[in-house]
Amino acid sequence: MSKKILSLIALAATLNAAAQKDTLSGKPLDEVTVTTASKVEQKQNTTGKVITVISKEQLEKSGAKTLGQILNEQVGIVVNGALNNAGNVQTVYMRGANAGRTLILLDGIPMNDPSTINTDFDLNLFTINDIESIEICKGAQSTLYGSDAIAGVINIITVNKNINKAFNVEATTSFGTKNTTKNNIKLYGKAGRFTYTTRFAQLKTDGFSSAYDSAGNKNFDNDGYKGNVINTSIQYEATKHFSVRSFLQHSSYKADIDAGVFSDKRNYFIDNNILNSGFSFNYKKNNLNVVANYQYSQTRRHYNDGFSAGLPVYTTNDYNGITNFYELFASYKIKKKITFLIGNDYRFATMDGAYVSSAWGASKYKDTSVNQYSVYASILFHSLNNKFNFEVGGRLNKHSRYGNNSTYTINPSYNINKNWRLFSSIASGFKSPSIYQIYDTWSGNKNLKAEKSVNYEAGVQYQNNKFKARTVFFNRNINNGIDYNYISFKYFNYIKQTVSGLEMEATFQPIKQLTIAANYSLLSPKETTQNRTTNMDTITYNYLLRRPKNVFNINFGWQASKDFYVSVSGKFVDQRFDVGGWAKPDVKLKNYFLLNAYAEYSLNHSIKFFVDAQNIGDRKFFEVNGYNALPIMANVGITFKWN
């Protein structure tokens, strides 16, 4: 196994890349504009932060993949559950950080679910049809984005800035294995000072059994899924300098689920809904830019465990969460060399729940809330020759329960020449305890403090006409991580976690038609926590649950002609550990290699046919102990554009 890993590292070092296409586009960094790194528009080569852009073109070459599966191919990211049955929990682990330590943004605004233990957002509620591009910014980003941004942020951008015609249509439909159908349509246009976008997407599948039939009885039923997403956005340019945008999104899905590890259940389902709405104002004149954002988000999750043969007990669980987010920030440039940014935000979250059992009656989780207010500021400096860039910033946060905390960011970078650049960062991050962790009747702890981290990283990047590569080393330290105490049965600040790692990515285009892309991630962790076998003493683990030490992705893309494109990709995931059960040793999950393929043919500007296949070898593997991962899956589809 060590020889295989060394071979993969060697290959990654020479022709590595992010498995999609920023990557494949070969666009120079001084032509890529990003906003997530510093909350202001800037060229990617002027920030020292580690940022990856997944473009609209890349997303369109993703076939029938989900958002979680696309993120799972990026360097340094593991989305555990992305390769399980539709509707299963998808947990984002960036650079090995625990669940809920990677902040999901929607057009720059935090997305949280206060009704969950870790407040992490359900990726099942997004579809690729909703997205124009994705910006991934790694490292502690709490200075600009607040709680949960310990490992980084993933900014899902839905705003299309390049709309000129009054009416445009894009639609895709596909059909595949397990009776899977995907349909989506987007209507958008610009009329006078108004710009509008409306999207609808639907995913339906018969699926496969979520739980693994370890006894081989072959009597586990398939667990189906049906989801819908509809969203709309309207922007009005009141003047040359001032615009306002309103948005509304409703996402819902119903998924059959099983009783647990190795355990089937025929009348058990989850019904998940989110309503997301808000508005933003933007004033931009000369060197001044002022942005105001407001977002209201309501999540409702309903679990229904119906009567089953031999189990005449009926139970339901309901969890409801509401968040309100307000933000106002402004940036000002001085002679294009110095940018000052100052802002503040207010976050209010509340949750309630109810449990009903035909055997035990009903109980309710009372409506409980928390709020936090922050002020933040940063300074960006660019030297006269644009070689040296420097960002420094800080945030002060006041939480209604635990009080005050602060963060900082120091981020220099240096462009040696047009090919080489160096960058580094020292930054702190934090995660506020969730409402559940504070107020739950049995496990809540009202004395919990914010989990704090310090992140160090340094890297080098190279690019020429045919090859580009980036290598990053990082180290993250947490001394008061939030964990569950198996002695007192309450949450407490206890975990000590140190994670060092290496990320390597590159793209190589030996000839015009061929692009080779690959990435490699290495984790070297130490986590001191309670012993999961005894639940009594303290132990230091040299691994992280469900997070492999080595991950390697590679993609070969061939543009055979202007109209025909084909790609083959592979993914290697090293062995990792998962929970073995209550007071049992952790279990080791085997490594695996998956082979995928994609092809598309454009009949003309308006019509494109595509086919994609995942796990071509039908490899049997597990992402989560006791749950099935996807078998061989294939989809064929057609895309229509009128624009």
PLM segments and residue spans:
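N-terminal periplasmic "start-of-domain" segments of outer-membrane beta-barrel proteins
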Residues: 31-62, 91
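Extracytoplasmic beta-strand/coil segments of soluble accessory domains associated
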Residues: 68, 72-110
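Short acidic/polar hinge/loop motifs at secondary-structure boundaries
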Residues: 110-138
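Structural signature of Gram-negative outer-membrane beta-barrels, strongest in the C-terminal barrel
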Residues: 239, 335-341, 345, 349, ...
